[in-house]
Amino acid sequence: MKNKYKSVVVEGSIGVGKTTLATMLASSLESKLMLENFSENPFLEKFYKDVGKFNKYTKTSKYALATQLYFLLQRADEFKGKEYQALKRHNIISDYFIEKDKLFAKSILSSDEYRLYNRVHDGLKLDIEKPGLVIYLQTDAQTLIGRIKKRGVKFEGNITEAYLQKIIDSYTEFFHSYKDSPLLIINTSNVNVNDPHDYAMLLEEINKDIKGKIYFNPLS
């Protein structure tokens, strides 16, 4: 099946299944795959250790700003690099959305840090074409914790439900008013993309002329 969209972005909280679905779609839709590279961030493991202390009183980490600036600059380099320019000649499926940078920054940085982050962000003058389709994967924080434990990345073991709920709330707020691209919302508590029936229904939905915001609820 050909991909009718120049670019498709799969987004959602950590552990929700972005990379799995993006990889499947790239194969099914004969598209190039662009994956987030988080393993090179030298601050991420330290940040997640602090996240283990996250609660309603402690809402940030001394590594939060460095973590977010590293991701921002890394992604800016990727989108300006030769590899991405070559990828743009093809249809692309990605497991991250450049907009998520500001979403996470706003969620985890202090007000002073966020102002500094915005100065760096705005100074980069990133001009990236809006996706042809955004797929937003949802589930609850408790389910995410179970999936994170199952995949067994050691430093992710410090992630708490409180932290995940804050990220979920940030995504919900962001996509509530998002209108820049067609938006397909999937609750992965009810939809299993690894199930052949659900996945076939999803491909059928993606192949439609999606406009605005729709929720994917296949019949069982």
Predicted regions and their residues:
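Conserved lysine of the Walker
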Residues: 18
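Conserved substrate/cofactor phosphate-moiety recognition/catalytic segment
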Residues: 27-74
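P-loop (Walker A) phosphate-binding loop of NTP-binding proteins
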Residues: 13
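Glycine-rich phosphate-binding loop used to anchor ATP phosphates in small-molecule kinases
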Residues: 63-129
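NTP-dependent small-molecule kinase module
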Residues: 146-158, 162-220
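A glycine- and Lys/Arg-enriched "phosphate-lid" helix/loop adjacent to the NTP-binding pocket
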Residues: 101-169
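Hydrophobic anchor at the beta1->P-loop junction of P-loop NTPases
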Residues: 10
